[in-house]
């Protein structure tokens, strides 16, 4: 049985990963379940650095099992890759999704659709002992000039998925997970963990 420890205080993220490994000899445990309540300061300049900072923090606390952590950013080409590592706090510390979206739309006001290319990227850092691996999932699209769709969260209502003809907020959770950056990164995590199970 492999033990997978998730560096998150978000119960939804932990549950998502637990569901992902249902039926496999993998025990998924969150920080909360281990009684680790501290907030991890994300001071990295990239989402890769932030994912590693969180995973290393937890690895140093638990010293066993496989530790995973993830970070996600939205990168808009016209804005030189912004909001990127600052996606969650684009409009300021503790900004709401609505405030972040409003700031993004304001910065892109008058910019034609073909110049509004963007991509979401999720990085999952996997640490086992001294071994560190980064897994990546990317989803390409464009930023609309208005909100569209009721589902999802964050930038989902403004992110129009190339090849699907809908925003992420117009997809069901199941549809979103099949194509999303996070879904792609989680599939790579699953491949990695299943390979580890074979080695055991």
Swiss-Prot record:
<dbReference type="GO" id="GO:0036220">
    <property type="term" value="F:ITP diphosphatase activity"/>
</dbReference>
<comment type="similarity">
    <text>Belongs to the HAM1 NTPase family.</text>
</comment>
<keyword id="KW-0547">Nucleotide-binding</keyword>
<dbReference type="InterPro" id="IPR002637">
    <property type="entry name" value="RdgB/HAM1"/>
</dbReference>
<protein>
    <recommendedName>
        <fullName>dITP/XTP pyrophosphatase</fullName>
        <ecNumber>3.6.1.66</ecNumber>
    </recommendedName>
</protein>
<dbReference type="InterPro" id="IPR020922">
    <property type="entry name" value="dITP/XTP_pyrophosphatase"/>
</dbReference>
<feature type="active site" description="Proton acceptor">
    <location>
        <position position="71"/>
    </location>
</feature>
<dbReference type="GO" id="GO:0000166">
    <property type="term" value="F:nucleotide binding"/>
</dbReference>
<feature type="binding site">
    <location>
        <begin position="181"/>
        <end position="182"/>
    </location>
    <ligand>
        <name>substrate</name>
    </ligand>
</feature>
<dbReference type="GO" id="GO:0017111">
    <property type="term" value="F:ribonucleoside triphosphate phosphatase activity"/>
</dbReference>
<feature type="binding site">
    <location>
        <begin position="8"/>
        <end position="13"/>
    </location>
    <ligand>
        <name>substrate</name>
    </ligand>
</feature>
<dbReference type="GO" id="GO:0009146">
    <property type="term" value="P:purine nucleoside triphosphate catabolic process"/>
</dbReference>
<dbReference type="Pfam" id="PF01725">
    <property type="entry name" value="Ham1p_like"/>
</dbReference>
<keyword id="KW-0546">Nucleotide metabolism</keyword>
<keyword id="KW-0460">Magnesium</keyword>
<dbReference type="GO" id="GO:0009117">
    <property type="term" value="P:nucleotide metabolic process"/>
</dbReference>
<dbReference type="GO" id="GO:0035870">
    <property type="term" value="F:dITP diphosphatase activity"/>
</dbReference>
<feature type="binding site">
    <location>
        <begin position="153"/>
        <end position="156"/>
    </location>
    <ligand>
        <name>substrate</name>
    </ligand>
</feature>
<feature type="binding site">
    <location>
        <position position="41"/>
    </location>
    <ligand>
        <name>Mg(2+)</name>
    </ligand>
</feature>
<feature type="binding site">
    <location>
        <position position="176"/>
    </location>
    <ligand>
        <name>substrate</name>
    </ligand>
</feature>
<dbReference type="GO" id="GO:0046872">
    <property type="term" value="F:metal ion binding"/>
</dbReference>
<comment type="subunit">
    <text>Homodimer.</text>
</comment>
<comment type="function">
    <text>Pyrophosphatase that catalyzes the hydrolysis of nucleoside triphosphates to their monophosphate derivatives, with a high preference for the non-canonical purine nucleotides XTP (xanthosine triphosphate), dITP (deoxyinosine triphosphate) and ITP. Seems to function as a house-cleaning enzyme that removes non-canonical purine nucleotides from the nucleotide pool, thus preventing their incorporation into DNA/RNA and avoiding chromosomal lesions.</text>
</comment>
<dbReference type="InterPro" id="IPR029001">
    <property type="entry name" value="ITPase-like_fam"/>
</dbReference>
<keyword id="KW-0378">Hydrolase</keyword>
<keyword id="KW-0479">Metal-binding</keyword>
<dbReference type="GO" id="GO:0036222">
    <property type="term" value="F:XTP diphosphatase activity"/>
</dbReference>
<feature type="binding site">
    <location>
        <position position="71"/>
    </location>
    <ligand>
        <name>Mg(2+)</name>
    </ligand>
</feature>
<feature type="binding site">
    <location>
        <position position="72"/>
    </location>
    <ligand>
        <name>substrate</name>
    </ligand>
</feature>
<dbReference type="GO" id="GO:0005829">
    <property type="term" value="C:cytosol"/>
</dbReference>
